[in-house]
Amino acid sequence: MDMRLDYAQSLKDKRHTVKGLKDRLRHRFNVAVAEIDCQDLWQRAVVAAVTVSSDRGRAGQVLQAVEKDAAAFLGASLVSATVEWLD
């Protein structure tokens, strides 16, 4: 998930938003979440959520729900989201 945080005036502001999103997604969906890029930029963040399942359909449902919840939490700050599969 690629985010643009125009309101962030410092890394502290950014960390506050990213931590809130990570905690929310972990709690609601039992997924692993990490900031994976743009760590030193105040107004950008790239966050990944990961789930493991023997059922690809179920994993897809979880990741769709994660994306929807992130969009609700972030609003227009969520620029894009993609799903990658490892077989």
Region locations from a protein language model:
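C-terminal structural segments of small proteins and small subunits
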Residues: 51-87
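N-terminal first-folded block
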Residues: 1-28, 32, 69
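Residue-identity detector for glutamine
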Residues: 9, 39, 43, 61-64
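Short beta-strand elements
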Residues: 29-36, 77-83
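A structural signal for short, well-ordered beta-strand segments
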Residues: 1-3, 47-49, 81-83
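Short, charge-patterned binding micro-sites
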Residues: 34-55, 86-87
